[in-house]
Each structure stands twice: as C-alpha cells, then as structure tokens.
C-alpha cells in the first residue's frame, strides 16, 4: 500500500463508519463461531497484515494477539496494547516471526487482494492453525468494481464468494461460513466505485470521515448486519467474509 493510504487510515480508523461497523461484525463472528466453541478462557490469535492496528483492540478482547505487518511506517504507528505483540511479517514467505507457532484463530482482513500469490498465502497460513482452529478472512468483492480505489490500495484483484470459497477449499480448508457483508449499503458503494472511474487517479470516494450525522447513520445501518451474521448468508455485498476450519 502507498504511504498516503496508511496515513489516511490512521486518521479515520477509529471513527469512520466502515472501520467501526466492520470491526463490530467481525467481533460478532468471533464471539459466536470461535470463542464460544472453545473451553479456553483466552484464544491465541494471529493477524497477518494488521496495517495500522485498527482491528487489534477488538481481537484482544478474545485473547493474546500476535500481529504481523510488512510496512515499517504502519507497524511503527501501532500504539502499545496489553496482550498484543507486533512483528514484521508478510505472506506468503515472511512468517519467520511465528515459525513453529500455531494459533486458535488466524485472521486475514482485506489482505489477500494485496498478495499476488494468493493460493501460496493461504497454504502458508495452514501451517499456523492448531487442530480445530479457525481461519477468518475478508476480501473486497466483485472484479467489476475494481478501479481507482483498488489501485490506490495496491490490490491485485477482487473476489466473488464462489471464487473465494473454492480458493480456500483447494488449499485444504473446510468452509464453515461464507457470505457477504456491507450488503445494506452496497448500492451506494457500487455507485461510489463507478463514480471513481470519472475522477482523477489520485482520489477515491468515501475515504474521508463523513459529517457526524451521516457517519452515525451509515454506522447504524452497517451494524444492523450483526443481527444475521454469521447465521444467514446474504448473496451480495461490498466484502466477502469466510470462516474456515483446518
């Protein structure tokens, strides 16, 4: 990712409706489908590609977290947190920091689309999941939405649920849940991505925090999805989410 993308993330990750709503949904999935199924009081969790650390406080609610990030700038701007250790690492070939370690939950949130060798990345993660452990992933949806926003973020591709599910199955994972999130607001998101194609290459719609009232409304609408995720699988949305077992 470009440096300016990380800088923008640092400015918005605590308040932007998209970051907040996504964390709430992912926390619900972990609580209902991972944490409640184990007898241990704390999980051992690995997040690869943690960026500037926006998901780490949410993950730390469920156990001890090891976070890996390739970019030095992003890693250096993650504040210290109890129960969280941070190291340099990347996929598929940069997991030396967790060599020989296995985890109850491995997380990859909006990372796989940044990796050219996505199948190799998924294969490498399998070596770090304990028997009975889980892999939780999100990726950007629909290649037809690929545009300026993706180029700014350094994406190689977008996925459909079917393509993503089959990719994980080929690497030996059992898919426990597959669906889309950001479904209620998807029409607005699709319009914004199409609009980006008529803007300059250096800008993307929706990266700034909207005015307070609008930001609160969008967060409330996005958060409604916690009522059905991970029980129901909605057939469309801005992101694909998969929960896999090994």
Predicted regions and their residues:
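A C-terminal cap/extension of S-adenosyl-L-methionine-dependent methyltransferases
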Residues: 4, 185-246
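Feature marks short, surface-exposed loop/turn motifs that line or immediately flank catalytic pockets
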Residues: 74, 143-145, 184
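Conserved S-adenosyl-L-methionine
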Residues: 173-183
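A short glycine-rich, Lys/Arg-flanked "PGG" loop and its adjoining helix->strand segment in the class I
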Residues: 119-134
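Short conserved AdoMet
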Residues: 60, 79, 116, 130, ...
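Conserved N-terminal segment of class I S-adenosyl-L-methionine
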Residues: 1-101, 105-109, 119-122, 210-212, ...
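A short His-aromatic
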Residues: 110, 114
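Short, glycine-/aromatic-enriched active-site segment of Class I SAM-dependent methyltransferases
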Residues: 7-12, 135-157, 161-169
């Amino acid at each position: 990712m470009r440096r300016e993308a990380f800088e923008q993330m640092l400015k918005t990750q605590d308040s932007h409706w998209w970051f907040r709503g996504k964390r709430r949904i992912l926390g619900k999935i972990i609580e209902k489908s991972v944490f409640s199924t184990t007898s241990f009081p704390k999980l051992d969790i690995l997040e690869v590609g943690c960026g500037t650390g926006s998901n780490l406080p949410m993950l730390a609610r469920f156990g001890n977290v090891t976070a890996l990030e390739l970019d030095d700038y992003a890693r250096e701007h993650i504040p210290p947190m109890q129960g969280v250790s941070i190291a340099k690492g990347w996929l598929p070939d940069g997991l030396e920091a967790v060599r020989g370690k296995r985890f109850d939950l491995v997380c990859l949130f909006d990372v796989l689309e940044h990796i050219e060798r996505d199948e190799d990345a998924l294969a490498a993660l399998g070596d770090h999941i304990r028997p009975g452990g889980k892999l939780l992933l999100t990726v950007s949806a629909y290649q037809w939405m690929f545009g300026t926003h993706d180029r700014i973020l350094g994406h190689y591709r977008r996925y459909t649920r079917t393509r993503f599910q089959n990719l994980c199955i080929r690497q030996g994972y059992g898919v426990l849940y597959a669906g889309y999130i950001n479904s209620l607001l998807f029409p607005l998101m699709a319009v914004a991505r199409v609009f980006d194609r008529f803007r300059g290459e250096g800008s993307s719609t929706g990266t700034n925090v909207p005015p307070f009232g609008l930001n609160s409304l969008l967060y409330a609408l996005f958060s409604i999805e916690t009522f059905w995720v991970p029980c129901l699988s909605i057939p469309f949305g801005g992101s694909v989410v998969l929960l896999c077992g090994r």
